[in-house]
């Protein structure tokens, strides 16, 4: 605080004291006048009474008696004088002194408020005066401290200037306080005591005592200056100076005391003292930890000593055997007889994985003896065990209490404690990581008491339950395969088996498997116009633009049934043979159920789709024909048959109602029967009348499949449909998921990817070839215009986009040729011809060509009279699959001496997938000049036809063709046989292609 600010604060403080003195003087001085008048009257009355009683005495005796009474009572009883010149106690100076003692918290107590108003005003007055007094004295102490330090620095400077060898001493806390106290004691205690002795007539010791009590704000109040009755008369004007001296001395002595306390506070904040404090606190904590750890260790020692000294010296007496040990069951399996009315017979135990069955049987015949452990304290009978311990009879109660305490303590498992401390591997303990490997309850789920396990896994030799509605789940499948969860696959078989049973029980009944809310909506919202066929369905994006459009009651149900296109009036197939539900083998006549997020199968309607079902999924029309079933129109009932009104009321896809997009888009699901009939009528009318677009008149070419299209009722008039993996009729083909390797799966994905990218280019090539050779001009599709996009390398779509029906998948001919130079497909491509032969040609498969490194002059093969520049392209495959040494899958090896052709363990799907060439091979893409579609091409040439031809690269001649056998595929032998057969039939294929007829590639 600056000196000016402190002076201003001092002026405010003195003014505040003057204000308080005026208030107290006004209140207490008037009250003192009244009290003194009353005392005068009382003194006169007492004097008259005493003189009346002492009337028989002489005057001297009366005066002596009155003086003794006055001295004893400390109040005069003599006759008061006519004029009383005794000074008042509550003068203005004394009122100021009282206010100062209140704010400085000294509180002598010689004078105090005598009225209620004075006491209340004192409380309010001290609330403001005490803080102001503290701030003032703190600033004064800071000023004294700076002055003291300045004097000390000046002294050191003087000493260093006069003595070059002078080194200032490093003063400690105690030395600094003592040095600061010396001038304070001399200035504020010793000298003022002489003044008090002179004016108050006190001894010096009392004056020094008063000075110390006042300076330290103790303020007993037994001695107070300036309150003598004769001091004003005796000292005159010096008494006024004395009164001012008392106030000034009081202020500065308190300020110096604050300075000393500040020095002590600074010393306590030094680094050395902080270090000492830290050391002390750390030692206290360490001592506490040592005490706690020592006590804990001692408790463990005490427990061990009790066990060794007392418990082991007596014979333990156990209680009755627990009822849990008498039950005929094991800890790893539940008690199957607890919920039965009659007790089940004790079954014979069948050991699952054990080599000691004979030993256990022998021990069982001899009788099992349960050995009680000495550590199982909960089974001890406390009274019977310790009552015979004569030497330790005094400790019986103590031992009983200790045993009870130790028996109730259940320490946590060590593994969980370690996992909680160290976190395990990625925060999981060993039991959590290996939870899927346990087929029985974990350690934490056992109930006490726990019997030691004598085996790994076991099961009861119970009679297998007769399942009436589903295939039993023989075990809890925790493992996963690349084809899905075994438990979900098992549940799928159960759902299909239920459908088989329902189909056999109610052949003529109609069963609708819908969601409960959807079925309720369908029953509630029946309307007369339900049989109306919706011609157009507004997409959701456009529907949001019209939020106030009225919503039909059956709209929600129609949207749920419009996921796939369902033909109207089609009846499901006949019931097939039952499943062998005690094995994992699926028969040829069985079907696969379809799971939707674990809810069960969808409605088992029939469709030309690819998912076959026998009451639990989609039904493939082709397999009905293969099984020898009657046509759909001849069947009278099935497991599921939708009503015509309900079937027509559902929402149809915009791709089945608008035939132009449907003709261009390769969809996974076929159009409905109603839309298909309209599309056929339009195509027939356009073909006969010769009007309309050629794209709408052409047959909608669908995306190629890995499997040949099955023969169905609509196969002659529509494009082939993709078959399902579960639609095969061979017993070996049903196990394709378990026998197909990862390499075969990758090759299959490559085939689908390549064929999907080149789908439209194959159609354009077929149409272009027909136009160049004088074929059909009206019925073929229009060729797309060549744009700038064909000059850049194409961006191949991902695998997932193959099933999205993306219509923006357009690649130009030049890009397709460059793509052919990099990839190849095993799917047969339709040659230049009309749309009538496209389905038959697209379903054929061809072996892969040979991949070899050829010279530049050998790769440039020309055909035809035109000489067009050729492009040489040489590339390397950018990816590969790690080869495997397994030529035949495990467990499928034929017997010795058997032929691979006769005894082949490969499925039909694997034989088709094996035709895919090895990704490790390399190919050189030769080119040929453009030519007509009817010109014969030599082996190894490509017909580009102006950049739009889709002709495949033929294998090299036998002399230059290397072997395509690869060790990375288990189907290499079948590939060699297929290539040999193709080599023998190559001349006929070339001759057929040269004549202009469709040739198989």
From Swiss-Prot:
Q: Which UniProt keywords apply?
A: Glycoprotein, Ion channel, Ion transport, Membrane, Phosphoprotein, Potassium, Potassium transport, Transmembrane, Transmembrane helix, Transport
UniProt-listed InterPro entries = 2pore_dom_K_chnl, K_chnl_dom
Name the Gene Ontology molecular function terms of this record.
outward rectifier potassium channel activity; potassium ion leak channel activity; protein homodimerization activity
Query: What more is known?
Result: Inhibited by barium.
The membrane topology term of the UniProt record is:
Multi-pass membrane protein
UniProt lists the family membership as follows:
Belongs to the two pore domain potassium channel (TC 1.A.1.8) family.
Does the keyword Membrane feature in the UniProt annotation? yes
Per the record, the gene is Ork1
Query: Which GO biological process categories is it annotated with?
Result: locomotor rhythm; potassium ion transmembrane transport; regulation of heart rate
Which source organism? Drosophila melanogaster (Fruit fly)
Task: Please state the protein's primary subcellular location.
Answer: membrane
Q: Which residues lie within the region annotated Disordered? A: 591-668, 768-795, 830-1001
Domain of life of the source: Eukaryota
Q: In which tissues is it expressed?
A: Widespread expression in adult, strongest expression in muscle, brain and ovary. Also present at low levels in larva and embryo.
Q: Looking at the Swiss-Prot or TrEMBL record, what is one Pfam family this protein matches?
A: Ion_trans_2
Q: Which residues are glycosylated?
A: 58
Comp. bias (Low complexity): 832-841, 911-926, 984-1001
Q: Does the keyword Thylakoid apply?
A: no
- Topological domains annotated Cytoplasmic: 1-6, 141-170, 265-1001
What is the name listed in the Swiss-Prot or TrEMBL entry for this protein?
Open rectifier potassium channel protein 1
One Gene Ontology CC term in the entry: plasma membrane
Amino acid composition bias (Polar residues), ranges on this chain: 855-873, 961-983
Where in this protein does the record say Phosphoserine is found? 332, 373, 562, 565, 685, 691, 715
Give the transmembrane region(s).
Answer: 7-27, 120-140, 171-191, 244-264
Q: Where in the cell is it found?
A: Membrane
Q: What is the lineage of its organism?
A: Eukaryota, Metazoa, Ecdysozoa, Arthropoda, Hexapoda
What is the role of the protein in this entry? Background potassium channel. Rectification is dependent on external potassium concentration. Acts as an outwardly rectifying channel but as external potassium levels increase, this is reversed.
